[in-house]
Amino acid sequence: MDPEGLQFLLPPASLAALANSWLQEDCPGLNFASLVTGSAPAQAVLWAKSPGVLAGRPFFDAIFTQLNCQVSWLLPEGSKLVPVVKVAEVRGPAHHLLLGERVALNTLARCSGIASAAATAVEVATSTGWAGHVAGTRKTTPGFRLVEKYGLLVGGAECHRYDLGGLVMVKDNHVVAAGSMEKAVLKARQAAGFPLKVEVECSSLKEALQAAEAGADLVMLDNFKPEELHPTAATLKAKFPNVSVEASGGVTLDNLPQFCGTNIDVISLGMLTQAAPALDFSLKLYAEGDIPVPHARRS
């Protein structure tokens, strides 16, 4: 999917609400630093200072839109960043530009970091010849899920389910609460109706076969070592060829190739949203007529 088109997935009302909440969090009261700058027109350059994938432009825009500032992008969403590179220019009242600076940088850095990790994971997996899907998980930061899931998409990975309503997932605790695997899956099937699929988390071949027999659409083989994963998936697929198999738990960028196999349809990595390092961006003001530089020095 073209990263530039992903912006249309984001509800404008959600973008505005998120931007407003982030700005409110950072400045809920008096902003004394604004007295230093006043409201004179100002301009700044956004610099990327670490390599990776650019992601999060719609959120960056939404923040500065709230502050009556204009952003002009020099690179498209999904661009590969080779530092140091000029990414965008921002213009607006000085006090508003600086009010949005840190919030916008934090959002862009986090989203780009996730996109970069996702892009690396997809590249690692496809380099093995595997044709399945790399996905994130629901292990996201409360209040920041839209940004993080969007970053996965820009990086070429799948969201998995966005929230609890996107897929009925039966986990080990559901099985305990329901009384048995069969009861849990049957109740999930009834709740799902025709629009939703049912996925069941399994920790053994026995559980996987029970889940498929009960009507699961997807079986997650959770925390399997690669040497156990592939024989289990092969046995499951041989008996239930229409059931999709997901590998999850303990997967990192380093060991990802070991989880790729012909009987694995999806590999999900919690680390894409939990452990991806943020990229380094800076926003530097410059005087009209001066040449913008990434590291401004006072003389």
Curated annotation (Swiss-Prot):
Highest taxon, organism lineage: Eukaryota
Transmembrane segments: none
GO cellular component terms, A-Z: catalytic complex; cytoplasm
Positions contributing to quinolinate binding: 102, 138-139, 160-161, 171, 201, 222, 248-250, 270
Keyword set, alphabetical order: Glycosyltransferase, Pyridine nucleotide biosynthesis, Transferase
Stored InterPro entries: Aldolase_TIM (IPR013785), NadC (IPR004393), NadC/ModD (IPR027277), Nicotinate_pribotase-like_C (IPR036068), Quinolinate_PRibosylTase_N_sf (IPR037128), Quinolinate_PRibosylTrfase_C (IPR002638), Quinolinate_PRibosylTrfase_N (IPR022412)
Gene: Qprt
Renumbered residue ranges of the record's region Important for hexamer formation: 8-12
EC id: 2.4.2.19
Pathway assigned to this chain's UniProt record: Cofactor biosynthesis; NAD(+) biosynthesis; nicotinate D-ribonucleotide from quinolinate: step 1/1
Keyword Iron-sulfur belongs to the record: no
Disulfide bonds: none
Record's function text: Involved in the catabolism of quinolinic acid (QA).
Catalysed transformations (reactions): nicotinate beta-D-ribonucleotide + CO2 + diphosphate = quinolinate + 5-phospho-alpha-D-ribose 1-diphosphate + 2 H(+)
Assembly behavior: Hexamer formed by 3 homodimers.
Coiled coil segments of this chain: none
One GO process term, biological-process aspect: quinolinate metabolic process
Organism: Rattus norvegicus
GO MF term set: identical protein binding; nicotinate-nucleotide diphosphorylase (carboxylating) activity
Annotated family: Belongs to the NadC/ModD family.
This protein's name: Nicotinate-nucleotide pyrophosphorylase [carboxylating]
